[in-house]
Amino acid sequence: GLGGADPKVYSDGQGCHVDVAGRTSPLCEYGDTSANRTMVLFGDSHAASWFPLFDQFSREKGWRLLSRTKSSCFVEDLRFPLYGTDLEYAECFDWKNWVVNELQENPVDLVIVVTKRKDVEILRDQFSVEEWQSGLVSTLNSFRSVSSDVVLVGATPLLNNHARECITSYPNNLDFCHGQFEDVVPSDYQALEIQSADDAQVKYLPTIDLVCTGVSCPVVVGNNVVYRDRQHLTKDFVLELKNLISISLLNAGINLD
């Protein structure tokens, strides 16, 4: 399909992308499982979108990869309802605590924390910017105590249109489907992420320039569909970013070699 299959972490039969009800993760080891260096990919479905790339990095560069992702589970240390309900998402809080406890028993070399837009409705309506930021810093701090390195991967923009549906409907007018930069990238967007990473003394990997020009955030770049819906990057596009992400990681002070 448009942009390749969804990451195998969704469908490998182990339940590695934990569903709403889950409070723990299965083992879910990838990459070079015998390697003496371990990286952890942590977050919700946005983190799972990056899985194909870090899976490839870990296989090529000799890392063991632990996939720790859970559906609709914001990384910020805040008490919020499950998306679409009024019920507190206790399974998310329990799962996050479980992951940190797991790593306290077996510390790792790198934790990759993937955040999502702070202005998703559920967070924007319930928490101030300061509360959101302190919740993110709290999560980052908890990983600093269990990992040699922590990197915060910045959120990718939320489009106004479902990319694949829009491309199918307007194949000859893709401009209609692109996100306009000023519409989909709030001005304080990266500054808040950078500040949070600085406060927690962790590394930061910006993503806006990977998916947007100064004018728009296109749904197609070259031969690759960028988004599979309004917010998740496609497998093919993520893999296409390999060299750029390698450079960005090095610039952030993380060398996977």
Predicted regions and their residues:
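Extracellular/periplasmic envelope-modification machinery, especially enzymes
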Residues: 1-257
